[in-house]
Design a protein with these regions (language model features):
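N-terminal helix-turn-helix DNA-binding core of bacterial DNA-binding proteins
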Residues: 26-73, 99-106
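A general structural signal for short secondary-structure boundary/capping elements
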Residues: 12-13, 85-88, 118-119
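DNA-recognition element of transcription regulators
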Residues: 75-77
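Beta-hairpin "wing" of winged helix-turn-helix
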Residues: 85-95, 102
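Base-recognition residues in the alpha-helical recognition helix of bacterial helix-turn-helix
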Residues: 53, 79-82
Length: 125
């Protein structure tokens, strides 16, 4: 005899709250979810998350510092940093022969540190 399991991931009947649905649909209008999705895609790369975390720990780091931290070449570090800069996760400033990177703003730091705290809760139970 085969055991039947209920699907707990979906409603058993289709019924929705029209007022709630219309309110939320209205709130979705005009939002730039494509840019938000792009930001999360860039952060889906483990190396870039490490770089972003490093930038949370220090006010700024030069490309050489980042390369040393992640154990790669300056060119590779610069490539990853460019992705972070293009989506306003990080910003850069050239000083003489060095380029320094920092987080674009406090929102990014909050986002990253909140995600890290959430992940740590999962691991620690």
């Amino acid at each position: 005899m085969e055991k039947q399991t209920k699907n707990i991931d979906t409603c058993e009947v289709f019924s929705y709250d029209e007022e709630v649905v219309e309110t939320v649909k209205g709130q979705l209008t005009g939002q730039r979810f494509d840019r938000l999705a792009d930001m999360f895609k860039v952060l889906a790369d483990e190396t870039r998350v490490k770089i972003a975390y490093a930038l949370c720990q220090q006010k700024e780091l030069c490309v050489c510092d980042v390369a040393s931290i992640i154990g790669t070449t300056n060119a590779t570090a610069s490539h990853h940093l460019r992705h972070l800069r293009n989506l306003r996760i990080a910003k850069s400033e050239k000083r003489g022969k060095l380029v320094f990177y920092s987080l674009d703003d406090e929102h990014i730091r909050t986002l990253l540190m909140t995600a890290i705290a959430h992940q740590k809760e999962e691991v620690d139970g």
